[in-house]
Amino acid sequence: PDHAEFLQYIENHDETRYRVECGDDAAAAAGAAIFTLPGVPMIYAGQEIGQRGRRDAIAWDHAREGVRDRYERLIAVREDHPALGPEGNLDRVGYHVASGDLSERPIVASGDVHPDDVVAFRRSDEDEQLVVVLNFAPESASVAVGVDHADRDLVTDESCVVVDGEGTERIRVDDVAVVREAEE
């Protein structure tokens, strides 16, 4: 039906925790993916505090505040930017990736060819266009996207743009960066 949406999740009671299987860095990016891709995000019991056990009682006394804070920011960004919600469009954007040191040779990614750890896409509605970059790698990446964009990450509210040795602006991303696309 028109009013139905897919549920987006990375963990449930039948599977080992994503954080245990893939590590903290990939879990942070996957958590960001469920809030930036189309669909309804589902947070499984304790995922928002870094819970590691599958069917254990939620260990509130051992909550990882950094994980909880990150989920709070992702929820706030999704609420503040309807383009990330169910009515938002999802489109590809071309991008180039350099991990770690900006002097490294970039990996070209466009069309159906993607580096394993990074993906970039556009979410848009009639009011705004956002570029989302997800990095599942354990180290930060520098990503040049094929559209003009602002320099402030909406998740961290900090500048995320760096310039490489050739003068190319790149989005520096640990796990996720969401930036506004520049208006024409």
What are these regions (language model features)?
Residues 1-54:
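Conserved alpha/beta catalytic core and glycan-binding cleft of carbohydrate-active enzymes
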Residues 72-75, 150, 175-177:
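Membrane engagement elements in two modes
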Residues 14, 48-50, 126, 136-139, ...:
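Short, glycine-/Ser/Thr-/acidic-enriched flexible segments
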Residues 51-112:
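Aromatic- and carboxylate-lined catalytic core of secreted/periplasmic carbohydrate-active enzymes
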Residues 94-148:
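Carbohydrate-binding surface patches
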Residues 140-162:
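Beta-strand-rich binding/interaction modules
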Residues 162-184:
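C-terminal beta-strand-rich structural cap/linker in extracellular carbohydrate-active enzymes
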